[in-house]
């Protein structure tokens, strides 16, 4: 808000599931949980065969209307060690983390000519 722009995304590994207090605190502060809106049955992390989202995308009300897609890009969690994917030991993009990256597509409001 220092810059006067209310379009805010909070993105990262929150190490908490949707029902846990840290996530609920952010939602209660007025941020929309974009993962729950666009990919509520998806996952970005798997541990002992339990899949879920620890990686979150939250949007301020003005930004939430500009978010058009949120979803995990499954290039890590689905490639586990028993299948021969060893972390960082080959030249592929697979299994470099225990989390999948979360992709976000936004459609920003066009700038008016007076702002150019």
Each predicted region: which residue ranges?
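Metal-dependent phosphoester-hydrolase catalytic domains
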Residues: 1-9, 14-111
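Proline-enriched interdomain boundary motifs that mark the N-terminal boundary
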Residues: 112-116
């Amino acid at each position: 808000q220092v810059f006067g722009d209310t379009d805010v995304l909070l993105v990262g590994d929150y190490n908490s599931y949707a029902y846990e207090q840290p996530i609920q605190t952010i939602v209660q502060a007025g941020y929309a949980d974009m993962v729950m809106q666009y990919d509520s049955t998806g996952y970005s992390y798997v541990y002992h065969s339990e899949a879920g989202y620890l990686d979150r995308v939250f949007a301020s009300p003005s930004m939430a209307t500009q978010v058009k897609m949120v979803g995990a890009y499954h290039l890590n969690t689905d490639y586990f060690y028993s299948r021969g994917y060893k972390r960082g030991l080959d030249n592929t993009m697979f299994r470099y983390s225990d989390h999948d990256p979360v992709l976000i597509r936004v459609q920003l409001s066009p700038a008016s000519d007076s702002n150019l």
